[in-house]
């Protein structure tokens, strides 16, 4: 293995092509409802795409290139990753893993506080050396050309990467698919992974004889998610290739497919831009568009969706945000996590903790890993 420095580049020709496609979008009719119950409303889809074509700042590549990035071949696949070393000599190694529809961009606001707490008003004893890879088929990692790249194989690749960087003892953190990969990492490399911190504890609602009001609410939320919120995952887990033809060719389609999740999964007051700026939303959508990764990213659902809630035996920490997809109670979490050493319920935030509540997530990660330093 030999990591090579890497920078993200977006050409003017690529931007011009995107703008042309957006301006030529053939729109469907308006939805016959006055809410989001049928998906992204036409008016917002049109406004979002107008903004993307006319006044969006395409500088996400430059913001990402501020941090050291590399590519290396692991298990036959080119993997893109950020590797930000702390100025503190005793910093603790940590691998951060994003999910869908996220990317390594979501970590830009937490990299500084995690790697250099002294410069951000924190305790230098909490410093981390951070490695943040792009999942296979996501961002600037290669797209697998064969099956088999599920969460376990990805976890093994992450362990190989960490060892190649000289880290024989490290922690793992993630949300969404990052939570599944981080949990799997604790299982495949228990001799090196001291603990895993997750900001998505995907746990089946418990069936207790004495459920609390919060547990009953979680059960109802689970039922509602199954009824109205699983369409995207059913498609991605069964027909990712078919879906990809539309999303890879139509930026409006790609934007709508992702933006709807920033409404459904964030702590907002009815509109995604209550929780995230339009710039942030379009940054994340742009990663998928410019890397043409709609299809390859969806294949992770085909590979591993049935294994998302596998038992976790590694020392674990769970931070529960109130508008996340699942919000287990402590005893519900104990049904999946057999060595749960940190459990906190936060007052604000949703599925995208690093984007919505970066300061909160940093504090949670610092607190959990103090147990292992």
Predicted regions and their residues:
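Conserved acidic catalytic loop of the alpha/beta-hydrolase fold
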Residues: 152-170
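Glycine-rich "HGGG/HGxG" loop immediately N-terminal to the catalytic nucleophile
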Residues: 58-60, 122, 126, 135-149, ...
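Non-catalytic accessory segments flanking enzyme active sites
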Residues: 14-86, 90, 280, 289, ...
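C-terminal subdomain of alpha/beta-hydrolase-fold enzymes, centered on the catalytic histidine
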Residues: 236-373
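Alpha/beta-hydrolase
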Residues: 1-16, 21-22, 26, 194-286
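Conserved hydrolase catalytic core segment
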Residues: 113-120, 127, 167-217
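Conserved HGGG/HGGXW glycine-rich cap/lid loop of the alpha/beta-hydrolase fold
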Residues: 87-140, 369
């Amino acid at each position: 293995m030999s990591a090579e420095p890497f920078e993200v580049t977006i050409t003017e020709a690529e931007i011009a092509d995107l703008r042309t496609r957006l301006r030529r979008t053939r729109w469907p009719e308006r939805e016959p409802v006055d809410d989001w119950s049928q998906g992204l409303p036409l008016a917002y889809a049109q406004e979002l795409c107008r903004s993307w074509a006319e006044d969006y700042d395409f500088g996400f590549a430059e913001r990402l290139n501020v941090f050291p990035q590399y590519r290396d071949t692991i298990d036959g696949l080119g993997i893109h990753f950020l590797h930000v070393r702390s100025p503190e000599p005793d910093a603790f190694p940590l691998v951060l893993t994003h999910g869908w529809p996220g990317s390594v961009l979501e970590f830009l606001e937490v990299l500084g506080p995690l790697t250099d707490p002294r410069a951000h008003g924190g305790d230098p004893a909490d410093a981390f050396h951070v490695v943040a890879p792009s999942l296979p088929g996501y961002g600037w990692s290669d797209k697998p050309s064969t099956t088999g790249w599920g969460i376990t194989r990805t976890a093994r690749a992450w362990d190989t990467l960490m060892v190649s960087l000289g880290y024989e003892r490290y922690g793992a953190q993630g949300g969404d698919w990052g939570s599944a990969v981080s949990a799997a990492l604790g299982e495949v490399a228990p001799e090196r992974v001291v603990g895993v911190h997750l900001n998505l504890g995907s746990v089946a609602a418990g069936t207790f004889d004495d459920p609390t009001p919060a547990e009953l609410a979680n059960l109802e939320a689970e039922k509602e998610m199954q009824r109205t919120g699983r369409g995207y995952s059913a498609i991605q887990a069964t027909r990712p290739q078919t879906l990809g033809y539309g999303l890879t060719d139509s930026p409006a389609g790609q934007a709508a497919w992702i933006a709807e999740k920033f409404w459904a999964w964030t702590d907002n007051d009815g509109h995604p831009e209550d929780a995230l700026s339009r710039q942030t939303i379009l940054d994340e959508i742009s990663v998928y568009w410019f890397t043409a990764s709609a299809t390859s990213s969806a294949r992770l659902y085909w590979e591993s969706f049935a294994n998302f809630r596998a038992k976790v035996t590694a020392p674990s920490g769970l931070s529960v945000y109130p508008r996340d997809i699942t919000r287990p109670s402590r005893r519900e979490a104990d049904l999946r996590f057999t060595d749960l050493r940190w459990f906190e319920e936060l007052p604000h935030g949703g599925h995208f903790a690093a984007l919505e509540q970066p300061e909160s997530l940093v504090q949670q990660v610092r607190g959990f890993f103090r147990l292992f330093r």
